[in-house]
């Protein structure tokens, strides 16, 4: 028995320890040069920051996690007055928004209203004294979101983890259904694409300008102007305007390569989630045009404004 234990330790020890020994010096160096200074700016009494009002970008969440700054993400809606849950300060779990507050019930259901078990993705529903009675003088809208037994349908896709924490997975109305029947949530794909230094914003589509389902995904991409111009200078790409530069073949190939390196099986994406084609746009999104007052992207407005580009993406030869 002792020999078996020694063999077990001898096998796993280098596998577990060596990666830690390689990473730890880098972590200490980062802490000394950068992270420690960031934490010092927040003061000695800082315990945690709060994020809310919109989806908390995964790249920012990971950054503060690495820095050692605790950010607790909250989730709620106006219809739930408004807070449903908050990521705990003690033992927070990345990407989770915490367990429901006292007095609030949550469940996840499928498209037929059947309650799903733990770790199954579906639509998040809420019940409790915090939930509204209905929309003022709009029984038609109330009927769409309230069940007969008092559950409010948030329209958000979520998973309940084994420890009863909520993990948001996107908006149900944003779900893309391809011609092959594949269901795709665009937000995780866009969030990953937007981690590229060369990309400011991206919008993923699976329908053409007539809102007809297609066989593959495409994306509208807004380049990061400063990074693209630096790249052009380093690579001696001549241009007379940013519009000309952004739409040049060299920049298009750069952005396509960036997206291909991010959206692939190595990063957990399926083959049908890859971006088949892109169209480059150069006008930043504005509140009241492509963005809501809460800075949230209005996909239907983007689709309408750039319907000509969507038509080209789905009609030009592959």
Task: Describe each region flagged by the PLM.
Residues 106, 164, 193, 219:
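Residue-level signal for inorganic ion chemistry
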Residues 131-132, 165-194, 227-249, 269-272, ...:
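Adenylate-forming
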Residues 155-157, 175, 196-226, 266, ...:
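C-terminal boundary motif of the adenylate-forming
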Residues 1-92, 105, 199:
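Gly/Ser/Thr-rich phosphate-binding loop
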Residues 2, 76-80, 154, 179, ...:
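Ser/Thr-glycine-rich phosphate-binding loops at phosphate-binding pockets of nucleotides
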């Amino acid at each position: 028995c002792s020999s078996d234990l020694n063999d077990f330790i001898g096998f796993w020890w280098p596998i577990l320890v060596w990666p830690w020994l390689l990473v730890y010096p880098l972590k200490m160096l980062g802490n000394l040069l950068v992270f420690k200074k960031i934490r010092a700016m927040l003061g000695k009494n800082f315990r945690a920051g709060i994020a809310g009002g919109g989806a908390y970008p995964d790249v920012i969440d990971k950054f503060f996690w690495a820095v050692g700054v605790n950010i607790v993400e909250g989730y709620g809606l106006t219809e739930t007055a408004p807070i449903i849950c908050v990521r705990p300060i003690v033992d927070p779990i990345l990407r989770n928004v915490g367990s429901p507050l006292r007095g609030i019930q949550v469940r996840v259901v499928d498209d037929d209203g059947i309650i799903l078990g733990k770790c199954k993705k579906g639509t998040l529903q809420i019940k409790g004294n915090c939930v509204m009675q209905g929309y003022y003088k709009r029984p038609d809208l109330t009927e769409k979101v309230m069940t007969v037994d008092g559950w409010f349908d948030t329209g958000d896709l979520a998973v309940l983890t084994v420890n009863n924490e909520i993990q948001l997975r996107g908006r149900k109305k944003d779900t893309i259904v391809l011609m092959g029947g594949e269901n795709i949530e665009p937000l995780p794909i866009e969030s990953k694409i937007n981690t590229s230094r060369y990309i400011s914003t991206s919008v993923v589509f699976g329908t053409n300008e007539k809102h007809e389902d297609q066989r593959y995904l495409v994306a509208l991409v807004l380049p990061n102007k400063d990074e693209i111009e630096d790249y052009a200078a380093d690579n001696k790409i001549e241009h007379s305007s940013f519009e000309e530069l952004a739409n040049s073949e060299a920049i298009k190939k750069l952005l396509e390569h960036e997206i291909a390196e991010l959206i692939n099986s190595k990063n957990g994406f399926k083959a049908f989630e890859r971006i088949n084609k892109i169209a480059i746009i150069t006008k930043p999104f504005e509140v009241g045009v492509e963005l809501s007052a809460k800075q949230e992207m209005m996909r239907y407005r983007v689709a309408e404004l750039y319907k000509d580009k969507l038509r080209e993406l789905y009609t030009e030869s592959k």
